[in-house]
């Protein structure tokens, strides 16, 4: 990811995205540069319009909207569990104990 970040930084600074410039940015950040990755990223970004990609990336819907639905489902499940526990209770321990004490009179 740091290679992409370096490329975006160069793009924002209006600098050429080249192997040398990416390497300089990564080295300045104290990152050990992998020459294979460096060449792959530089070659992949040569014919890419980064401005266009950034526009489409910001236009994509965010998935965070789905999170509240999950909370509602969890809350509903918790309420069902509480109802089941209340239904299962039956007679209390005192009621059961009172019936047994009459046996030993």
Swiss-Prot record:
The modification Blocked amino end (Met) is found at residue 1. The keyword Plastid does not apply. Keywords: Ribonucleoprotein, Ribosomal protein. Residues 77-92 have a biased composition (Basic and acidic residues). Residues 65-105 are annotated as: Disordered. GO terms for biological process: translational elongation. One of its GO terms (molecular function) is structural constituent of ribosome. Residues 65-76 have a biased composition (Low complexity). One of its GO terms (cellular component) is ribonucleoprotein complex. InterPro entries: P1/P2_N_sf, Ribosomal_P1/P2, Ribosomal_P1_arc. Belongs to the eukaryotic ribosomal protein P1/P2 family. Forms part of the ribosomal stalk, playing a central role in the interaction of the ribosome with GTP-bound translation factors. Part of the 50S ribosomal subunit. Homodimer, it forms part of the ribosomal stalk which helps the ribosome interact with GTP-bound translation factors. Forms a heptameric uL10/P0(P1)2(P1)2(P1)2 complex, where uL10/P0 forms an elongated spine to which the P1 dimers bind in a sequential fashion. This is Large ribosomal subunit protein P1. It comes from Sulfolobus acidocaldarius (strain ATCC 33909 / DSM 639 / JCM 8929 / NBRC 15157 / NCIMB 11770).
